[in-house]
Amino acid sequence: IILPYIIKTKFLVFRTTHIKKHLLRSLLNLPAMLLYFSTLVMLPIEKVTAISFIVPLIVTILAVMFLNEKIYIYRTLALILGFSGMLIILRPGVIDISIGVYMALFSSLLWSIVIIITKKIAKDDSSITILSYQSVFMTMFSFFIVLFYWETPNAITFVYLVLAGACGTVLHLALNHAYKLVDVSMTQPYSFLSLVFASIIGFYIFNEIPDLFTWIGACVIFIGVLIISYREMKLEKEIIRKSIDIKN
């Protein structure tokens, strides 16, 4: 999908001083993606999405350790609410924990590390550069897997794959740019919103009806997102106001 742009820039998009980080990022991203897709076959989509909500917690901890980011009270509260909502949905100890759950958890761990690496790279490289390296490296790594497991898709499946690729491209460009603009820990509470969308998609497309605990957990998660959104907008207004006062 991004190949025309790469050719248009005469491959200048690959200019970077972080080639090793790009390589490591792709090496971790591929198994994270494969594990995630595998769990979608084993578990309902809203359950897989809920499990992935451990990512914001891991990322926030890693951001403090490796990016020297500070954790403010509102971000912490939003994360606690988001994680609590996830526990309400999963109900560990009440429902059976299958191999699919463990696969989803390991995928989340790998993806958390990928996010931290992305933040480090994003300081110097553009979103399109990060995505270009990801596309090239992951295509190379996937080639060896495809040799043994290739299945020719039919017309409908091919259309779905193209749509998934387009959505994935937009997703990664947006995420990479977000990590460039703000602290990575600030972006994490917003990821909890995906549960709401996943539940809606699961209901209308796959006939997967979310249970009562899924909706209760979703409400808790949404409250956390509202808190962080309100606080960050308020902080931004204060910064703008102070900037105007200084100029005057």
Residue ranges of model-derived segments:
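Glycine-/small-residue-enriched transmembrane alpha-helix faces in small-molecule transporters
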Residues: 96-120, 237-248
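Cytoplasmic-side transmembrane-helix entry/capping segments in multi-pass membrane proteins
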Residues: 16-27, 71-83, 100-105, 124-136, ...
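Helix-helix packing/entry segments at the starts of transmembrane helices
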Residues: 49-54, 121-136, 172-204, 228
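C-terminal transmembrane-helix exit sites in multi-pass transporters
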Residues: 38, 55-77, 196-215
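Hydrophobic transmembrane alpha-helices of multi-pass small-molecule transport proteins
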Residues: 74-90, 213-232
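Juxtamembrane helix-entry segments on the extracytoplasmic side of multipass membrane proteins
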Residues: 14-18, 86, 91-113, 147-163, ...
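Hydrophobic/small/kink-forming positions within alpha-helical transmembrane segments
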Residues: 26, 30-34, 56-61, 86, ...
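Membrane-interface interhelical linkers
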Residues: 1-24, 73, 123-125, 136, ...
